Regions:
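Conserved glycine-rich cofactor-binding loop
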Residues: 11-12
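The beta1-alpha1 cofactor-binding region of Rossmann-like NAD(H)/NADP(H)-dependent oxidoreductases
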Residues: 52-62, 94-95
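A glycine-rich helix->loop->beta "capping" turn
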Residues: 66-79, 85
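Substrate-binding pocket helix/loop in short-chain dehydrogenase/reductase
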Residues: 88-89, 96-98
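Active-site helix of classical SDR
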Residues: 112, 148-151
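Residue(s) in the substrate-gating loop at a strand-loop-helix junction
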Residues: 132
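C-terminal beta-strand-loop-alpha-helix "lid" module of Rossmann-like NAD(P)-dependent dehydrogenases
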Residues: 165-214
Length: 284
């Protein structure tokens, strides 16, 4: 019997690449996104498309019901849909802050609620939650985004213990800098929100760093391969840091005090070459 996987945010980047790999592995894959017109290549590859907005409860219920009626099972849920809108905390409207939580946390949690009854019935399943190294550290202008990713980490750790007796694994994926449309969207929002406020100078420096980091990031396929490894492993790790210098950055973070890491982050924004970490490793 073919295993069934549901992937959110499948219209681009990590979600799209993971869908392709799982089809090649013999999975029945449902790819969900708001923009199904961007998934025609996935449909041709054998992915079944679902129009889903993770902030729309009725749409999520409908899609899960449709999938379960057709397949009778769900083996993997990849909570990949995400949204990043940067700006100084003082400048970001509360409506925008709430929307980030709706997409990155509440949508993830609700979709998980919807698939869990079937997974418990099967007494097996795997939930893969896309976090970020941003769930382990902060940076200027990212207060709301990082808050959502810290929440993903805490939610996943608690859920893992709740589901152990049912044979359901919960795995956290922590990507570093990845070349996707996400960075461009976050950069654009940051400049629009704080580029001409009291935080303007730091904002412009940060935006320039985003542009450099995007060029040095890993391709989405790097993270997708890690996700497939987590899905297919007999006993997966509880979390995987992957791509875009993720392991190095988290290692450096573990060595430094909070104030030392703050200084490192702020100094990185002044760098103009690829030696950001070498030049900035220790405070001067």
């Amino acid at each position: 019997m073919r295993k069934v996987a549901l992937i959110t945010g499948a219209s681009s980047g990590i979600g799209k690449e993971t869908a392709k790999l799982l089809v090649q592995q013999g999975y029945t894959v449902y790819g969900a996104a708001r923009r199904t017109e961007k998934m025609q290549d996935l449909e041709q590859a054998g992915v079944k498309l679902l129009a889903m907005d993770v902030t729309d409860d009725a749409a999520m219920v409908k899609c899960v019901d449709q999938m379960l009626q057709a397949e009778g099972r769900i083996d993997v849920l990849l909570n990949n849909a995400g949204y990043g809108s940067y700006g100084a905390l003082e400048d970001v409207p509360m409506s925008e802050a709430r929307y980030q939580f709706e997409v990155n946390i509440f949508g993830m949690a609700r979709l998980t609620q919807l698939v869990l009854p079937q997974m418990r019935k099967q007494r097996r399943g795997r939930i893969i939650n896309i976090s970020s190294i941003g769930g382990k550290l902060g940076e200027p202008h990212g207060a709301w985004y990082h808050a959502t990713k810290y929440a993903v980490e805490g939610l996943s750790d608690s859920l893992r213990m709740e589901l152990k007796e049912f044979g359901i694994d919960v795995v956290i994926i922590e990507p570093g800098a990845i070349i996707t449309e996400w960075a461009g969207i976050a950069r654009e929002h940051m400049l629009k929100t704080s580029g001409n406020t009291a935080y303007g100078e730091l904002t412009r420096k940060h935006a320039a760093m985003f542009e450099r980091a995007d060029k040095m990031g890993s391709q989405p396929i790097v993270v997708a391969k890690t996700i497939v490894k987590a899905i297919t492993a007999n006993r997966p790790k509880t979390r995987y840091a992957t791509g875009g210098g993720a392991k190095l950055i988290l290692f450096v973070k573990s060595l430094l005090s909070d104030r030392m890491f703050d200084s490192l982050m702020l100094r990185m924004m002044k760098q103009t070459d690829r030696q950001v970490w070498t030049n900035s490793f220790l405070p001067k």
